Amino acid sequence: LKLRYYQRDAIDSLHHWFANRPAEDHALIVLPTAAGKTIIFSHFIKEILAKDPTARFLVMAHRKELVEQAETKLKTVWPDAPVGVLAAGMKRFEIDSQILIASRDTLASPKRLDAVGSFDYMIIDEAHNVPPSSHTRYKKIITTLSDRNPMKVMGCTATPYRMGQGYIYGNRKDHFFKGLAYSVSIPELIRNGFLCRLSAYAVNEDAIIDAGAVALKFKNGDFKESELEKIAMVDDTILQVINDWIDNAY
């Protein structure tokens, strides 16, 4: 699998970051959706293990789909990769794997955190989900494992900010990531033919939800999905959205 120029640049930037920064300086790479973030960290893992066959990796994601995607992409890059999965939703508990792709919620239990041992590198997919609060599952996992062994940590995201916090990297106390190891923009990837140009269409105004008319509850700086579903998942709205999509997409 031939890497695109920016994917190679991102990997080289990560190597440089970890070679020149202390372990507590966590790195962030920012690439648009569909730029191949999973391909990047899969190649990065393979290159590190080629130099240090004893290194151990934890890839952490918060959704089952992201766990499955990470395993698939890693095996595409490296079919014989020593990879396993820890995810209750997939009924897989391969905790001794050299490359462990783990569901955040499955790993967060004290029993499993104790059982997985230590890691040299941690990769966090969809890193904007790491909240500033220290009393979260993410922080519990990271703190516990870092106390066990000072891991080198990197995050991947297309959106390096959170509501109520702003950017998730920098030198403030609530910044988990110390800086950008690498980033590339949507316009650059469009210009170079790696992403399609965008065409945006507004849906029929009959389908627009008046969220201001309902007292929606927040959770971790965002609307609660269950609250949104109450006003969004209704037949008239869904039908109008589907009709608009068909009219504009075909």
Over which residues does each language-model region extend?
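Walker B catalytic acidic pair
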Residues: D125-E126
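Conserved Walker A/P-loop ATP-binding site and its immediately adjacent core
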Residues: A35-I40, P53-T76
